[in-house]
């Protein structure tokens, strides 16, 4: 991986790291809110629509298996280019899907591309950014994704409203991915002028030969801190699955759903840098625990509102509260994994840590879909809320042990 001195300026990462993340986030943000509605239009029931919505995080989990190896072998830039090309293919497949199963495969591939894309930028930031401002830098990276998830739903809703076609949200993703490719191909990457060891040779020398080997070698920290990160991932993925499903179940249109999700994403985006300041000044714990408790309580509240006369108003309020709570924890998974990763070759560990977080992110919406199939969406929502509060306790116990707070200089 790259090596770096402490002569760092934020503008040096703005275009090579943050702009591609923003564009990719816009594309994802346009597509995610309408996935359950499109799945329903292709013949899926409410539980089936939830299952298809979960495919994006299942794809991310599958992508975590080779992503650390891929980034270590071919580098961050080439990995992002490959991920952008895969996402274009996935969304094209979604546009031409003739049934729910084909659409689900497309969403899975989109998640796969997102995993490689995200890890490539995180690996670059981990080695390029000094430790003294790492949390702020990684929160800013997370904020660039969140800015995309904020802008994407609004652009998607606008296009759907103007054209009357939900397919325009998918076309927006393709456009964003093409721009990402252009940016990556023509823009200078700071890593090109930095000392770079032979990552393939280093990878073999350090015997970082695979994801599951890395997981085994770091099983202690991954069980204790990674399990909590898995709950964080589960809460976030459940939010992205439950809110659009809830909108379908109370009869909201695709355009209205995208607008409400966008409002929640705006609250999320507004707090990304504040999250980094909290982590750098007070410690990682004071970001993640309030975030998880806030999201858990919001989901518990939502679970009791489905049949109330003001169900739509409650839905809007909860979407905003969840956005605020998630924003307070912006960048926490990337920051914790960067804190714990070895400096010389962080990508395999980052992939392993992301795998544990994405395992939770994949299991949570699958569990939601299963509970909806046998019981109700309200029960599934309440259970996820309780698990979120329990996860806050796991991290409150283990973060001080593995990542003791050191005040920024």
Q: Which sequence ranges carry the predicted segments?
A:
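Juxtamembrane intracellular "pre-TM" segments in multi-pass secondary transporters
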Residues: 2-11, 189-225
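Helix-loop boundary and gating motifs at the non-cytosolic
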Residues: 8-54, 221-228, 233-246, 250
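Core transmembrane helices of Major Facilitator Superfamily
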Residues: 28, 110-121, 321-333
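Helix-to-loop junctions at the C-terminal end of transmembrane segments
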Residues: 63-75, 271-284, 372
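C-terminal ends and interior cores of transmembrane alpha-helices
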Residues: 86-98, 294-308
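Cytoplasmic helix-loop-helix junction between adjacent transmembrane helices
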Residues: 108-145
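Symmetry-related core transmembrane helices of the 12-TM Major Facilitator Superfamily/SLC fold
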Residues: 169-185, 381-396
């Amino acid at each position: 991986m790259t090596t770096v001195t402490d002569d760092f300026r934020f503008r040096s990462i703005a275009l090579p790291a943050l702009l591609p993340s923003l564009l990719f986030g816009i594309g994802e943000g346009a597509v995610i809110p309408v996935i359950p509605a499109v799945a329903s239009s292709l013949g899926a029931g409410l539980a089936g629509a939830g299952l298809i919505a979960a495919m994006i995080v299942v794809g991310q989990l599958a992508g975590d298996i080779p992503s650390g190896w891929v980034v270590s072998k071919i580098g961050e830039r080439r990995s992002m280019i490959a991920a952008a090309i895969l996402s274009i293919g996935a969304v094209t497949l979604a546009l031409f899907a003739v049934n729910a199963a084909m659409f689900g495969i497309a969403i899975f591939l989109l998640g796969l591309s997102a995993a490689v894309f995200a890890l490539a930028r995180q690996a670059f930031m981990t080695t390029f950014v000094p430790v003294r401002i790492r949390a702020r830098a990684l929160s800013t990276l997370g904020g660039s994704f969140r800015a995309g998830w904020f802008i994407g739903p609004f652009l998607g809703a606008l296009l759907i409203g103007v054209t009357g076609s939900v397919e325009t949200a998918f076309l927006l993703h393709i456009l964003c991915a093409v721009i990402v490719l252009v940016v990556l191909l023509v823009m200078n990457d700071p890593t090109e002028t930095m000392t770079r060891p032979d990552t393939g040779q280093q990878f073999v020398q350090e015997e970082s030969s695979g994801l599951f080997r890395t997981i085994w070698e770091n099983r202690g920290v991954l069980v204790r801190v990674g399990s909590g990160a898995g709950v964080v991932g589960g809460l976030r993925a459940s939010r992205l699955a439950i809110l659009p499903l809830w909108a379908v179940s109370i009869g909201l249109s695709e355009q209205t759903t995208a607008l409400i999700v966008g409002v929640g994403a705006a609250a999320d985006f507004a707090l990304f840098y504040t999250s980094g300041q909290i982590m750098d000044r007070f410690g990682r714990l004071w970001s993640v625990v309030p975030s998880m408790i806030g999201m858990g309580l919001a989901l518990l509240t939502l679970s009791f509102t489905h049949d109330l006369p003001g169900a739509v108003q409650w839905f809007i309020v909860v979407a905003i509260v969840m956005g605020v709570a998630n924003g307070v924890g912006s960048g926490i998974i990337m920051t914790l994994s960067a804190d714990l990763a070895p400096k010389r070759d962080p990508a395999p560990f980052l992939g392993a840590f992301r795998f544990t977080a994405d395992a939770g992110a994949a299991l949570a919406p699958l569990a939601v879909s299963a509970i909806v199939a046998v019981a109700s969406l309200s029960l599934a929502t309440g259970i996820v809320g309780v698990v979120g509060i329990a996860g806050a306790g796991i991290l409150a116990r283990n973060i001080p042990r593995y990542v003791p707070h050191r005040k920024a200089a």
